[in-house]
Amino acid sequence: MDHGGAREWMVVDAAEHMEIGPALARKYDFLIIEDDPYYFLQFEKPWAPTFLSMDVDGRVIRTDSFSKILSSGLRIGFLTGPKPLIDRVILHIQVSTMHTSTFTQIMISQLLQQWGETGFLEHIDRVVEFYRTQRDAMLIAADKWLKDLAEWYPPAAGMFLWIKIKGVSDTQQLIMEKALQKEVLLVPGGAFNINSSEPSSYVRASFSLCSPAQMNLAFKRLADLIKEAL
């Protein structure tokens, strides 16, 4: 759900049809694992509903991440769901990875206790505003350099812009060889296919750390490479 335009389509569709998920789970007797690490990075309110919010008979296990909203170095997330299912997950963790770093767990626990719910949501608002500003800067750079060379939709959440390169059937060589030589770091769309060897005309650009000047320079270089490829 972090792929720019792809995610935007999913949000619109989900708002109208997400209730189908729990209904199908009930009809065919299966569980839903809702993996949504960018949920708290939605740029517009009200936020899209979750499967968990619609769960009435304990069929949804939801996973969230503190890494996206506090610090990536923490490498810690949390599960929400029916207690019997969560208890089984805990038993599995105890005989596999043990658990996430105790130190980082204590840090986050103390921080959340100090903030409370209000402080946590205020922090989320600040994080969202930061990424919204970053997103807008990347959209400006994309519109300046890639308008006639690629297609994209403004992402509704997250920290990535999903771009389709016109006239390029596979971006693997363009991104992993030519772009790298120009010090432009992007991810070719094929990396997100079930079969990563399948060709893809898409690339993913991150706006999490780059400055507007870096975004502008990167897309200028990408535009030059696309023109050469065409």
Regions found by a protein language model. Give the residues of each.
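PLP-dependent class I/II
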Residues: 1-230
